UniProtKB/Swiss-Prot annotation:
InterPro entries: Ribosomal_uL29, Ribosomal_uL29_CS, Ribosomal_uL29_euk, Ribosomal_uL29_sf. Gene3D superfamilies: 1.10.287.310, 6.10.250.3450. Residues 85-123 are annotated as: Disordered. The modification N6-acetyllysine is found at residues 19, 43. It is found in: Cytoplasm. It comes from Oryctolagus cuniculus. The keyword Ubl conjugation applies. This is Large ribosomal subunit protein uL29. GO terms for molecular function: mRNA binding; structural constituent of ribosome.
Amino acid sequence: MAKIKARDLRGKKKEELLKQLDDLKVELSQLRVAKVTGGAASKLSKIRVVRKSIARVLTVINQTQKENLRKFYKGKKYKPLDLRPKKTRAMRRRLNKHEESLKTKKQQRKERLYPLRKYAVKA
């Protein structure tokens, strides 16, 4: 089997990708048997290509799966941990903008009774 390109895989459906993955795994097992029995050098060099092709297929499957999950959870209140933005622990625990802007009754009263004074400087 020739080297597989990821862009060719992206257009395929999941069933097709899984079938191709099975074919590649069968081919890899045959190549490994040929390696043990003393197969040709062309077959031995093909092992690497097949392994990388399997990795490409799995990568495309996982990426499309994650993309679909992102679409599903878009706009929802709760998301799985792996779909949330990766921040530091401190940043995740920080107050959000709304919580930061909240003021106590006492603070609101003080600001209302004693507004900020504006001074004009005479030139």
